[in-house]
Amino acid sequence: LRQSQFVGSR
């Protein structure tokens, strides 16, 4: 899981 996706999920 990339940090970019994690941030976008927020």
Curated annotation (Swiss-Prot):
It is found in: Secreted. GO terms for cellular component: extracellular region. GO terms for biological process: neuropeptide signaling pathway. It comes from the Eukaryota. The keyword Cell division does not apply. Keywords: Amidation, Neuropeptide, Secreted. The modification Arginine amide is found at residue 10. Contractile action on the inner circular body-wall muscle of the animal. This is Urechistachykinin-1. It comes from Urechis unicinctus. The lineage of its organism: Eukaryota, Metazoa, Spiralia, Lophotrochozoa, Annelida.
